[in-house]
A protein has these predicted regions:
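Short, surface-exposed connector motifs at secondary-structure boundaries
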Residues: 73-77, 99-105, 153-154
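Two-metal-ion RNase H-like nuclease active-site motif
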Residues: 48-58
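Charged alpha-helix within mobile-element recombinases
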Residues: 98, 119-199
Length: 199
């Protein structure tokens, strides 16, 4: 009211104004657990096994890339899928993380419908899943940043039917062998293995 003065009183539709409240911050995904409930240890990056997930879309109708990044080591996983249907994305995530199942504690998603099968993912991997607030990409900033690096290999608008699994593997390998300043210029893949063996 302070910003709009008394003008809101003259609005039609029953004198109602839009207010961004709790309902606008709630995930549309069924049984979604909010990022607000995520353990503090995930933010601190003290342990191995907390992941962020996303999808990168190709040119319309040509498929998607499922991406996962581990928060402590920055290990980055990519898989090409035919579509971003929830069942397809569910299967991809389970396949990607099963080799690292001992290092999967949590997975944080955005509110895309492709992650609607999160309960099945939890069951398969023995992990807890959390959802960022809508329109809050910074809450998964690591994944967003890693996807930006992936775009150097697979630019936005690429027809993913023309991208081979080998292309994806090479991009993933480059990202995991790229020294990171935040890791003391060490490589994500080596950092991941160091912590994995020490556990």
């Amino acid at each position: 009211k302070a910003r709009g003065g008394q003008l809101y009183r003259h609005l039609r539709q029953g004198h109602k104004r839009y207010r961004k409240g709790a309902s606008s911050l709630r995930s549309p995904i069924k049984e979604a657990r909010s990022i607000d409930e995520r353990p503090a240890i995930v933010d601190s990056r003290e342990r191995l096994g907390d992941w962020e997930a996303d999808t990168v879309l190709g040119k319309q109708g040509t498929g998607a890339l499922v991406t996962l990044v581990e928060r402590k080591s920055r290990l980055y996983l990519v898989k090409r899928v035919a579509s971003k249907q929830a069942g397809v994305v569910r299967d991809a995530i389970i396949e990607m993380l099963t080799p690292y199942i001992e290092q999967v504690h949590t997975i944080t998603f955005d509110n895309g419908g492709e992650f609607a099968e999160h309960k099945a993912i939890e069951e398969a991997l023995g992990a807890e899943t959390y959802f960022a607030h809508p329109y809050s990409s910074w809450e998964r900033g690591l994944n967003e940043n890693s996807n930006g690096l992936l775009r150097q290999f697979i630019p936005k608008g690429t027809d993913l039917r023309e991208v081979t699994d080998e292309d994806v593997r090479r991009a993933e390998q480059w990202l995991n062998l790229r020294p990171r300043k935040c890791l003391g210029f060490r490589q994500p893949v080596k950092v991941f293995e160091e912590y994995r063996q020490a556990a």
